[in-house]
Amino acid sequence: MILYHCSPTPGLRTLEPRVTPYFGKPCQLCLTELRPMALFYGIRHFEYTYGYTRAGELYYMEQFPGMLAELYGGKSASLYLCDEREDMAFTAIPHERVTANPVPVREEIPVPDLLAALREQERLGAVRLIPWEQVDEANRRWIVDAERREILERDLLSHPEDPMARYLRAKYPESWALARQERESP
């Protein structure tokens, strides 16, 4: 089976395991069976807001207006195709495999614009992209609360110049204010 890995770094011949700075995972290399899921990782960022419906369908839900275009629009990447191996383990994330070992690249596909590539995958029915305008009130409230918890759990109020803190403060001001209020209340 072919597995995908996407990176903003072109020209790789071997994919190396690494530690991601914000997710608390061990040194590993992540791959997936799904092209659109891999495309989400063509950027290095703090959040990848995709998920799966109960029917197992992949979706991406914007968490603020214009999120998809801001994060992916005009950004290039390389989609790497690799062969599945016995040392690749499934994770709790559907369609994801991880390994602690380097993996040779079978093929590299340049992706000149990740947003255009994701929209093409949506057109093909491989992913549903949900714009902010279609996010219902219950999900909007969940987003505010989830980001509030993230701010508190990572103690970002104490480190306001941390890149993640600056991003969350700018994109989720209501969550930032609620976290500050919660921390300051007796």
Predicted regions and their residues:
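Conserved NAD+-utilizing ADP-ribose enzyme module
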Residues: 41-186
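Short, flexible beta-strand-to-coil junctions
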Residues: 5-12, 33, 81-86
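ADP-ribose/NAD+-binding catalytic cleft of ART/PARP-like enzymes
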Residues: 1-29, 41-44
